[in-house]
Amino acid sequence: MASANVAEVDLAVIGAGLAGCSLIGRLNQLGSDLNIALIEAGRGPGGRTATRKRRDQSGWLLNHGAPGFGLSESMPEGMKALLAPLRSAGVLQRDERAVVSLNAQGDLSPANSPEACPVGGWWHGLPSMASICEALLSAAGSVELSRQFETRVRWLKRRQGHWLLENEDRTWSLRAKHLVLSGTLLAHPRSLKMLAWNDVPLRSAVDEGVDCSLDAVLSLLQRSQAEVRWNLMVDLGVLALNGEQLPAQIWLDNDAKKRWKVERLVLQPQSDGRWGLVVHGLDSGEAITPESQGRLMAQEQQRLVELLPELVQGLPVVSAALSQATPLGVMRWGASRPLNHPLPAELQWCPTSAVGFCGDWIEGPGFGRAEGAISSGVNLAERLHADR
């Protein structure tokens, strides 16, 4: 049972990805005086734009999720205002390196698919993708912000006009007047299998019939699906480059995806001359549970490592480095991209229960992309601020 002496905030935001951090960053810009707590299961901010560090190698930064994203030429004013300081500070920059396509024969050619070549080009964070979320959170402003990392919220309760959040063993808890979920895990049935939970936390917190807007959100999420990715991380060491430029990304065409069950490869230079490689592996469809996860991680690492010689045969300098390469494990992204049933924007905030939602799963032109995550956070921030 939670202690009676529980910290209380105006707003609890669960998830420190692009959406949650954009929400907080925009509230800051608007001069909000909210007392906010940010709760994140990972070690730091970033979500699917997170960056993996290594305890044994200082300076190693590997973007093991999204290596960058596209931005529309015309964005809403609030989104422009949010990103302008990041651009001027050099944290958000265009990635001018080449993006190429790989066919099923192992040949490389310039990429031309819409997913590999977003309109307006690729933008990335410097020195790493996680720098974007870090900058959004660190911007000076009026918001009072506390951060709680490496904490997975398991239990939600709605009582007496407040939310109570608790971790699995209830050793940590927090009270909040308002709640925002920037991901779907606590509201989606996938948590039942993936985490062996016996309930969907948000559904258990508010009985059906109490809040018709929230009922609509949860009903829609029951039908929504997302892609799973298994991302292999590799230290390639120092490459014997003789002035040649390596591509930033290698996207597999449809036939190559079918052959190798891989979406793309990402090459990332390190500050000490080494190179990192991330292979974005497609999912086999086998159920992910606490019992199967360890076996599936090992299985995917072995599968992707064994594919490397075929995948990089068109880059001799990378191929030659495989003998010295060190696999660094696999990152499983349980919901790397939503596929269907976007949440209508009018359901982003449910005032009866004081709960809101943001993320790339919100309906709009950016659905399924980083731009959608950012814009959903901005839109929700502006609504919350206007309602104060």
Features from the language model and the residues they span:
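Conserved flavin/dinucleotide-binding core of flavoenzymes
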Residues: 9, 44, 51-52, 272-388
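Glycine-rich FAD pyrophosphate-binding loop
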Residues: 12, 26-56
